[in-house]
C-alpha cells in the first residue's frame, strides 16, 4: 500500500523514469481511452488529473470559466508543469474533454505552447447499436495504426491479447477491492480506495497488478473502518479532497459510480481482440442500478455530488432518489475539491 500511495501522490514519478530509460509515455484524458492498445505498443499510459488550488493561468484564458474546474485544472497542469509526455490522447467522454481537445489542437496549430505533446482524439461512442460498434472498431483500428507509426513498432495480435488480459486482471482485482469496502469488511476508507485505484493509472500494468494484489492481502485482515456508510454518485473525483472531508465528518465512502472508482459496475472482461475491445468500450459503464449499488455496498445514505459546470448528474437525481431504499441527498454547485459537509449531514453523523 505504501508503494501505491507514493505512485498516487506523484503520478509522474514512474513516467519520468520510464522516459529516462528510453520508453514512450502516453498521457490520456478520460476513461474511454483503450489503454490496452497503449500497453500493447510498449508505451506507458498515464491518466492526467487536476489538482484543486492549482493556478489556472492561461488555461482559463484559453477555455474560459464555463468549463468544469477539474478539466481546467488538468489543462493548467499541462500548460504550466510540462509533464513528461510524448503523446496525449483525449477521449470524447464529456463535453469538457472535447472542448479541451479542440483547445489543445488549436494551440498546437498556432504554435502558442511549443512544449505541448501531439494530441489525438479518441472518439468512442456508447449508443447500443451495431452501427456504433462498427464505428468504434474503425476508430480503434485507426488508433492502432497511428500508435504503431508513433512508436515505430507493430502491435501484433499476441501483444494485444496479453495487454487485454493484463488489464482485465487489474479490473478483477479492483472488483475484489470493492468487496473489501462492503458489508462484513469495511476494510478501507474511501480515500484509501481512491488512492489504490488511482495509482493504477500512473504505473505499468505489470508493476501495478502485484502491488494491488499485495494491498488486497494487507487489507483482508483489517478491522472495519469507522463511519456511516455512504454511496457517492454524480461528478467524478480525480483527487481525494471531497472523500477526505466527508470521512473527517464521520462518513465512510463505501462505493461510487464514477470512473476514478473501483469499477464495481463495469461489464465482464473484454475478448482479447480489437473487435472485443471495441465492443467492451462501447458497453463500458461504471454505473449500477442505484438500488443494486446500495444493496452491494450496504450504504445507509446516497449522496449525489455535483460540481459547478458539471450539470449532467442533476438530471439523474430524481430517478436515483426514487429507486433507493435509503435517504438520498443532492448537493449541487460544489467547487472542485470541496464539499459542503453541513448540507450533507441531515440525519447522518454529527
State each model region's role:
Residues 73-149:
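Acidic/His-rich segments in extracytoplasmic proteins that coordinate ligands and/or metal ions
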Residues 25-97, 101:
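An N-terminal, globular interaction/scaffold subdomain
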Residues 85, 294, 298-304:
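Proline-aspartate-enriched helix->loop->beta-strand connector
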Residues 49-55, 60, 124-125, 257-262, ...:
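Short, acidic/turn-prone active-site loops that include or flank metal/cofactor-
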Residues 317-350:
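Peripheral docking tails and interdomain loops at the edges
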Residues 2-24, 137, 141, 145-265:
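A charged, amphipathic alpha-helical module
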Residues 77-78, 283-298, 315-316:
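A short, acidic, amphipathic alpha-helical segment used as a generic capping/interface helix at domain edges
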Residues 30-50, 227, 233-293:
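Redox- and metal-dependent alpha/beta enzyme cores, enriched for Fe-S-associated oxidoreductases
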Amino acid at each position: 500500500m505504501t508503494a501505491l500511495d507514493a505512485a498516487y501522490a506523484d503520478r509522474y514519478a514512474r513516467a519520468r523514469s520510464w522516459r529516462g530509460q528510453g520508453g514512450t509515455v502516453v498521457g490520456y484524458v478520460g476513461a474511454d481511452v483503450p489503454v490496452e492498445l497503449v500497453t500493447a505498443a510498449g508505451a506507458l499510459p498515464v491518466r492526467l488529473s487536476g489538482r484543486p488550488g492549482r493556478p489556472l493561468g492561461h488555461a482559463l484564458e484559453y477555455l474560459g470559466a464555463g468549463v468544469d474546474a477539474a478539466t481546467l485544472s488538468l489543462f493548467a497542469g499541462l500548460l504550466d508543469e510540462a509533464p513528461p509526455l510524448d503523446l496525449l490522447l483525449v477521449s470524447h467522454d464529456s463535453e469538457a474533454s472535447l472542448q479541451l481537445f479542440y483547445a489543445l489542437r488549436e494551440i498546437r496549430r498556432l504554435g502558442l505552447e511549443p512544449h505541448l505533446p501531439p494530441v489525438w482524439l479518441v472518439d468512442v461512442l456508447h449508443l447500443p447499436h451495431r452501427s456504433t460498434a462498427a464505428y468504434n472498431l474503425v476508430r480503434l483500428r485507426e488508433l492502432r495504426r497511428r500508435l504503431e507509426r508513433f512508436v515505430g513498432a507493430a502491435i501484433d495480435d499476441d501483444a494485444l491479447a496479453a495487454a487485454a488480459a493484463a488489464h482485465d486482471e487489474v479490473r478483477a482485482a479492483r472488483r475484489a477491492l470493492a468487496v473489501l469496502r462492503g458489508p462484513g469488511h469495511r476494510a478501507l476508507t474511501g480515500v484509501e480506495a481512491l488512492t489504490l485505484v488511482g495509482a493504477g493509472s500512473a504505473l505499468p500494468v505489470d508493476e501495478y497488478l502485484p502491488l494491488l494484489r499485495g494491498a488486497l492481502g494487507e487489507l483482508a485482515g483489517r478491522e472495519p473502518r469507522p463511519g456511516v456508510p455512504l454511496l457517492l454518485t454524480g461528478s467524478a473525483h480525480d483527487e481525494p479532497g471531497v472523500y477526505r472531508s466527508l470521512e473527517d465528518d464521520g462518513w465512510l465512502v463505501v462505493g461510487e459510480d464514477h470512473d476514478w472508482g473501483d469499477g464495481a459496475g463495469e461489464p465482464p472482461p473484454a475478448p482479447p481482440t480489437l473487435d472485443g475491445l471495441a465492443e467492451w468500450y462501447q458497453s463500458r459503464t461504471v454505473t449500477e442500478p442505484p438500488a443494486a449499488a446500495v444493496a452491494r455496498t450496504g450504504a445507509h445514505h446516497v449522496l449525489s455530488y455535483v460540481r459547478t459546470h458539471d450539470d449532467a448528474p442533476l438530471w439523474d437525481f430524481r430517478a436515483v432518489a426514487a429507486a433507493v431504499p435509503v435517504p438520498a441527498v443532492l448537493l449541487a454547485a460544489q467547487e472542485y475539491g470541496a464539499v459542503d459537509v453541513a448540507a450533507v449531514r441531515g440525519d447522518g453523523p454529527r
